[in-house]
Protein backbone atom coordinates (compact mmCIF):
# COMPACT_ATOMS: atom_id res chain seq x y z
CA UNK A 1 0.00 0.00 0.00
CA UNK A 2 1.40 3.38 -0.88
CA UNK A 3 0.35 6.85 -1.93
CA UNK A 4 -3.40 7.34 -2.03
CA UNK A 5 -4.36 4.11 -3.78
CA UNK A 6 -5.72 2.01 -0.94
CA UNK A 7 -9.14 1.59 0.61
CA UNK A 8 -10.22 3.61 3.69
CA UNK A 9 -7.16 5.83 3.42
CA UNK A 10 -7.40 9.11 5.32
CA UNK A 11 -5.25 12.18 5.75
CA UNK A 12 -4.48 11.89 9.47
CA UNK A 13 -2.94 14.26 11.97
CA UNK A 14 0.30 12.90 13.41
CA UNK A 15 1.33 14.82 16.53
CA UNK A 16 4.73 13.10 16.55
CA UNK A 17 5.48 14.08 12.92
CA UNK A 18 7.15 10.73 12.19
CA UNK A 19 7.66 11.58 8.52
CA UNK A 20 8.59 15.22 9.07
CA UNK A 21 5.01 16.39 8.52
CA UNK A 22 2.10 16.86 10.91
CA UNK A 23 -0.07 14.85 8.54
CA UNK A 24 0.21 11.43 6.96
CA UNK A 25 -1.88 9.25 4.67
CA UNK A 26 -2.86 6.00 6.34
CA UNK A 27 -5.40 3.96 8.27
CA UNK A 28 -6.89 4.87 11.63
CA UNK A 29 -7.94 2.16 14.08
CA UNK A 30 -9.94 2.50 17.27
CA UNK A 31 -8.81 -0.09 19.80
CA UNK A 32 -10.11 -1.40 23.11
CA UNK A 33 -8.15 -3.30 25.76
CA UNK A 34 -9.29 -4.96 28.98
CA UNK A 35 -7.05 -4.97 32.07
CA UNK A 36 -7.89 -8.11 34.04
CA UNK A 37 -6.79 -8.12 37.71
CA UNK A 38 -4.90 -11.28 38.68
CA UNK A 39 -3.61 -12.47 42.04
CA UNK A 40 0.09 -13.24 42.19
CA UNK A 41 2.71 -13.82 44.86
CA UNK A 42 3.65 -10.13 44.66
CA UNK A 43 0.07 -8.89 44.84
CA UNK A 44 -2.54 -7.91 42.28
CA UNK A 45 -1.20 -7.55 38.74
CA UNK A 46 -3.05 -6.77 35.52
CA UNK A 47 -3.22 -8.84 32.35
CA UNK A 48 -3.79 -6.58 29.34
CA UNK A 49 -6.07 -8.29 26.82
CA UNK A 50 -6.78 -6.60 23.45
CA UNK A 51 -10.52 -6.94 22.80
CA UNK A 52 -10.87 -5.36 19.41
CA UNK A 53 -9.58 -3.10 16.68
CA UNK A 54 -12.02 -1.28 14.40
CA UNK A 55 -10.96 0.40 11.18
CA UNK A 56 -12.34 3.91 10.86
CA UNK A 57 -14.10 4.17 7.47
CA UNK A 58 -16.01 7.45 8.04
CA UNK A 59 -19.36 5.63 8.23
CA UNK A 60 -19.29 6.38 11.95
CA UNK A 61 -17.18 8.88 13.85
CA UNK A 62 -14.25 7.56 15.88
CA UNK A 63 -16.17 8.47 19.03
CA UNK A 64 -19.21 6.48 17.90
CA UNK A 65 -16.96 3.53 17.05
CA UNK A 66 -15.39 3.66 20.51
CA UNK A 67 -18.78 3.91 22.23
CA UNK A 68 -20.12 0.92 20.29
CA UNK A 69 -17.07 -1.16 21.22
CA UNK A 70 -17.39 -0.34 24.92
CA UNK A 71 -21.14 -0.93 24.83
CA UNK A 72 -20.73 -4.40 23.31
CA UNK A 73 -18.25 -5.37 26.05
CA UNK A 74 -20.32 -3.93 28.91
CA UNK A 75 -23.32 -6.06 27.95
CA UNK A 76 -21.15 -9.17 28.42
CA UNK A 77 -19.66 -8.20 31.78
CA UNK A 78 -21.36 -8.88 35.07
CA UNK A 79 -23.33 -5.87 36.27
CA UNK A 80 -22.04 -6.47 39.82
CA UNK A 81 -18.43 -5.74 38.79
CA UNK A 82 -17.20 -2.17 38.70
CA UNK A 83 -15.64 -1.27 35.34
CA UNK A 84 -13.43 1.80 34.89
CA UNK A 85 -12.94 3.16 31.39
CA UNK A 86 -9.52 4.78 30.81
CA UNK A 87 -9.00 7.02 27.81
CA UNK A 88 -6.90 9.91 26.56
CA UNK A 89 -8.11 13.40 25.76
CA UNK A 90 -9.52 12.48 22.34
CA UNK A 91 -12.44 10.46 23.75
CA UNK A 92 -14.10 12.43 26.60
CA UNK A 93 -16.93 13.73 24.43
CA UNK A 94 -20.66 13.03 24.44
CA UNK A 95 -20.80 9.62 22.63
CA UNK A 96 -18.29 8.17 25.11
CA UNK A 97 -18.99 10.15 28.30
CA UNK A 98 -22.67 9.27 27.96
CA UNK A 99 -21.83 5.60 28.56
CA UNK A 100 -21.41 6.34 32.27
CA UNK A 101 -25.14 7.09 32.44
CA UNK A 102 -26.03 3.98 30.43
CA UNK A 103 -24.30 1.52 32.76
CA UNK A 104 -24.54 1.84 36.54
CA UNK A 105 -21.31 -0.11 37.08
CA UNK A 106 -19.22 1.97 34.65
CA UNK A 107 -16.96 4.80 35.80
CA UNK A 108 -14.44 6.81 33.81
CA UNK A 109 -10.94 8.20 34.37
CA UNK A 110 -9.72 10.34 31.51
CA UNK A 111 -7.22 12.96 30.51
CA UNK A 112 -8.88 16.10 29.14
CA UNK A 113 -7.74 19.38 27.64
CA UNK A 114 -6.40 21.79 30.22
CA UNK A 115 -8.86 24.44 29.00
CA UNK A 116 -11.88 22.22 29.75
CA UNK A 117 -14.49 24.31 31.57
CA UNK A 118 -14.78 23.45 35.27
CA UNK A 119 -17.31 24.80 37.76
CA UNK A 120 -17.35 24.93 41.53
CA UNK A 121 -20.12 23.09 43.35
CA UNK A 122 -23.37 25.06 43.80
CA UNK A 123 -23.83 26.79 47.12
CA UNK A 124 -26.50 25.84 49.61
CA UNK A 125 -30.05 26.84 48.75
CA UNK A 126 -31.01 30.25 50.07
CA UNK A 127 -34.71 29.52 50.45
CA UNK A 128 -35.61 32.06 47.81
CA UNK A 129 -38.02 31.25 45.03
CA UNK A 130 -36.69 29.99 41.72
CA UNK A 131 -34.68 27.10 40.40
CA UNK A 132 -31.58 26.12 42.38
CA UNK A 133 -28.22 26.73 40.75
CA UNK A 134 -26.84 23.81 38.76
CA UNK A 135 -23.23 24.75 39.47
CA UNK A 136 -21.10 27.41 41.10
CA UNK A 137 -18.73 29.88 39.52
CA UNK A 138 -16.20 28.91 36.87
CA UNK A 139 -12.87 27.60 38.17
CA UNK A 140 -9.37 28.14 36.86
CA UNK A 141 -6.82 25.36 37.22
CA UNK A 142 -4.60 27.76 39.12
CA UNK A 143 -7.25 27.90 41.88
CA UNK A 144 -6.71 24.22 42.69
CA UNK A 145 -4.13 23.88 45.46
CA UNK A 146 -1.11 21.86 44.32
CA UNK A 147 1.45 20.10 46.49
CA UNK A 148 4.52 18.06 45.64
CA UNK A 149 4.53 14.86 47.71
CA UNK A 150 7.85 13.40 48.78
CA UNK A 151 9.27 11.35 45.93
CA UNK A 152 6.92 12.82 43.31
CA UNK A 153 8.08 14.36 40.04
CA UNK A 154 5.05 16.64 39.77
CA UNK A 155 2.95 18.98 41.82
CA UNK A 156 -0.58 17.63 42.11
CA UNK A 157 -3.96 18.45 43.56
CA UNK A 158 -7.59 17.36 43.54
CA UNK A 159 -10.95 19.11 43.79
CA UNK A 160 -14.61 18.19 43.40
CA UNK A 161 -16.06 19.99 40.38
CA UNK A 162 -18.93 20.04 37.91
CA UNK A 163 -18.26 19.95 34.19
CA UNK A 164 -20.38 20.03 31.06
CA UNK A 165 -19.06 16.58 30.13
CA UNK A 166 -21.38 15.12 32.79
CA UNK A 167 -23.93 17.84 33.45
CA UNK A 168 -25.14 18.02 37.02
CA UNK A 169 -22.80 15.28 38.20
CA UNK A 170 -20.04 15.88 40.72
CA UNK A 171 -16.70 14.55 39.47
CA UNK A 172 -13.15 14.74 40.78
CA UNK A 173 -10.62 16.89 38.94
CA UNK A 174 -6.95 15.93 39.31
CA UNK A 175 -4.31 18.43 38.24
CA UNK A 176 -0.58 17.81 37.79
CA UNK A 177 2.08 20.38 36.92
CA UNK A 178 5.84 20.46 36.60
CA UNK A 179 5.76 24.12 37.66
CA UNK A 180 2.63 25.65 39.29
CA UNK A 181 3.79 29.05 38.05
CA UNK A 182 3.57 27.93 34.41
CA UNK A 183 -0.03 27.20 33.29
CA UNK A 184 1.35 25.52 30.17
CA UNK A 185 2.70 22.69 32.32
CA UNK A 186 -0.73 21.82 33.77
CA UNK A 187 -2.42 18.52 32.92
CA UNK A 188 -6.03 17.82 33.84
CA UNK A 189 -7.66 14.46 34.57
CA UNK A 190 -11.28 13.76 35.49
CA UNK A 191 -12.67 10.82 37.46
CA UNK A 192 -16.41 10.16 37.76
CA UNK A 193 -15.98 8.02 40.88
CA UNK A 194 -15.10 9.18 44.36
CA UNK A 195 -11.73 7.66 45.40
CA UNK A 196 -13.35 5.76 48.27
CA UNK A 197 -15.83 4.16 45.83
CA UNK A 198 -13.19 2.72 43.50
CA UNK A 199 -13.30 -1.04 43.95
CA UNK A 200 -9.59 -1.82 44.25
CA UNK A 201 -7.49 -2.75 47.24
CA UNK A 202 -4.53 -0.35 47.01
CA UNK A 203 -2.53 -2.11 49.72
CA UNK A 204 -2.58 -5.36 47.70
CA UNK A 205 -1.46 -3.86 44.38
CA UNK A 206 1.77 -5.08 42.79
CA UNK A 207 1.83 -2.16 40.35
CA UNK A 208 4.31 0.34 41.80
CA UNK A 209 2.62 3.42 40.32
CA UNK A 210 -0.77 2.49 41.76
CA UNK A 211 0.73 2.03 45.23
CA UNK A 212 2.72 5.25 45.01
CA UNK A 213 -0.14 7.45 43.82
CA UNK A 214 -2.45 5.93 46.42
CA UNK A 215 0.06 6.91 49.12
CA UNK A 216 -0.12 10.47 47.79
CA UNK A 217 -3.94 10.40 47.87
CA UNK A 218 -4.15 10.29 44.06
CA UNK A 219 -5.32 6.71 43.38
CA UNK A 220 -7.13 7.52 40.08
CA UNK A 221 -3.87 8.84 38.59
CA UNK A 222 -2.17 5.55 39.45
CA UNK A 223 -4.95 3.59 37.77
CA UNK A 224 -4.77 5.85 34.73
CA UNK A 225 -1.15 4.78 34.23
CA UNK A 226 -2.47 1.39 33.04
CA UNK A 227 -3.78 3.12 29.90
CA UNK A 228 -0.25 3.26 28.48
CA UNK A 229 -0.39 -0.50 27.82
CA UNK A 230 -2.71 0.10 24.88
CA UNK A 231 -0.05 2.29 23.26
CA UNK A 232 2.67 -0.34 23.53
CA UNK A 233 0.30 -3.05 22.25
CA UNK A 234 0.86 -1.69 18.73
CA UNK A 235 4.61 -2.33 18.83
Task: Say what each PLM segment does.
Residues 4-8, 39-235:
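Single, function-defining residue in the core of a domain
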